[in-house]
């Protein structure tokens, strides 16, 4: 689980409304996920910002990161799958592969559900922060450990030097 629900699991449920459910999957597992969702309507953001049907058995190119899922054409989107690369035993950031961490540190568990670590999710939100992303950062900041703050600070300095969140970290 990723996105706002991952932040809620860390900072407290019910802090704000959510528009969708974000689920991270490894790009290498995309065809298995597609088979599991047989009967659902799947659309790839290809090119980004444009949705097109994801054809059965089609391996999406590395530039495609998002898949939108709904039951059928008349239904609203139920959730978004986010494709991510994976290194051997490590999380590899799809936005910048220099950003890596042991896989066990990139995921945390609550009530049997795996969630993207808050420092990683906040890094993704930092690219073009909306009001809700700024709120997520403010809600998480006092709860982040020194190691989590350090990861987020280093990732932001590397990819978004001068980011406004750096001063708070």
What is the role of each PLM region?
Residues 1-169:
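Compositionally biased terminal segments of proteins
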């Amino acid at each position: 689980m990723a996105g706002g629900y991952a932040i809620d699991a860390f900072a407290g449920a019910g802090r704000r409304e959510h528009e969708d459910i974000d689920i991270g999957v490894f790009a290498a597992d995309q065809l298995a996920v597609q088979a599991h969702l047989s009967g659902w309507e799947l659309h790839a953001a290809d090119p980004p910002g444009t949705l097109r049907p994801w054809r059965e058995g089609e391996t999406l190119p590395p530039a495609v990161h998002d898949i939108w899922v709904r039951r059928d054409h008349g239904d609203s989107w139920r959730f978004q799958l986010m494709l991510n690369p994976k290194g051997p035993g490590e999380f590899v950031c799809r936005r910048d592969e220099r950003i890596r961490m042991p896989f066990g540190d990139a995921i945390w568990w609550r009530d049997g559900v795996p969630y993207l670590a808050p420092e990683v999710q906040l890094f993704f939100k930092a690219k073009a922060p909306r009001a809700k992303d700024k709120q997520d950062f403010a809600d998480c900041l006092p709860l982040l450990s020194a190691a989590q703050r350090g990861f987020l600070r280093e990732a932001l300095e590397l990819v978004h030097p001068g980011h406004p969140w750096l001063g708070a970290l």
